[in-house]
């Protein structure tokens, strides 16, 4: 694993809001990730989240039908698959996330297997953290390419520098370009950057980075594994997102999200 970051890489990440690390996984590691992620997805069957009544009503399940049309999306695989858990709990990944954001520690917010199916439509522009249950400038996501990610099969696009603020979120079902109508200042930023990657490469992006993904115009599925991290010490903002029902109901706005059974600490300098 290519897990050593240079000062230049950290500076680039903080300026642009994202970074691509080529050949993050070596050949053997890539095959291991492909197998273990694939097995975890297969064992989950048709369930986006762990098969537990405590997840009924979560935002992820509300959008299950819409997502199914173009994504095979499976979340929180670490909760019910030990081989995968060992991959995503790798302290080296957590340290990279903490170093890029300059925080003392990170917890898992959500992992997601994102398999963009053949001929699937685009993924609209969005920011991650405004959808989540905490407000933080230092949320961060790793996106690992299990297949080559190309302009033709659904690579990510990042708008450099867009991680400096939150933007108005378009109403569900509105056109892809609606975010630019609501937030014309985005048009003043550099043009979207296509994050093409060879299999085994990865990107990190800040939780406020405006990003999306192109359509898959090929007959093959494009596989990726992602994980969003929140800074240790983050507090609850009142949104449910993917929190289990019982835990969600136990929280008050401002409570620290430090339940290791829901948001495990994967790296800390302390």
Regions found by a protein language model. Give the residues of each.
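Non-heme Fe(II)-dependent double-stranded beta-helix
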Residues: 1-15, 22-125, 131, 240, ...
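Non-heme Fe(II)/2-oxoglutarate
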Residues: 43, 47-50, 60, 172, ...
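Active-site region of the double-stranded beta-helix
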Residues: 103-104, 129-135, 145-155, 163
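A short secondary-structure junction signal
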Residues: 121-127, 136, 152-158, 167-171, ...
């Amino acid at each position: 694993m290519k897990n050593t970051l240079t000062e230049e890489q950290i500076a680039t990440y903080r300026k642009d809001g994202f970074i691509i690390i080529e050949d993050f996984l070596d050949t053997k590691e890539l095959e291991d990730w492909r197998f273990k992620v694939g097995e975890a997805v297969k064992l989950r069957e048709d369930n986006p989240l762990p098969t537990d009544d405590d997840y009924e009503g979560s935002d992820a399940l509300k959008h299950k039908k819409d997502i199914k049309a173009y994504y095979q999306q499976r979340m929180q695989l670490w909760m019910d698959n030990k081989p995968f858990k060992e991959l995503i709990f790798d302290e080296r990944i957590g340290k990279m996330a903490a170093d890029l954001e300059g925080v003392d520690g990170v917890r898992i917010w959500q992992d997601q297997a994102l398999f963009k199916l053949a001929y699937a439509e685009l993924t609209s522009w969005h920011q991650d953290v405004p959808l989540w249950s905490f407000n933080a400038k230092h949320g961060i996501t790793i996106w690992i390419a299990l297949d080559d990610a190309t302009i033709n099969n659904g690579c990510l696009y990042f708008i450099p520098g867009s991680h400096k603020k939150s933007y108005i979120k378009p109403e569900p079902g509105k056109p892809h370009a609606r975010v630019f109508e609501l937030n014309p200042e985005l048009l003043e930023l550099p043009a979207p950057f296509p994050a093409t990657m060879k299999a085994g490469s990865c990107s990190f992006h800040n939780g406020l980075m405006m990003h999306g993904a192109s359509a898959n115009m090929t007959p093959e599925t494009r596989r990726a594994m992602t994980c969003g991290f929140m800074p240790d010490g983050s507090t609850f903002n009142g949104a449910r997102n993917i929190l289990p029902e019982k835990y969600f109901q136990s929280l008050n706005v401002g409570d620290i999200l430090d339940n290791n059974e829901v948001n495990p600490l994967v790296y800390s300098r302390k």
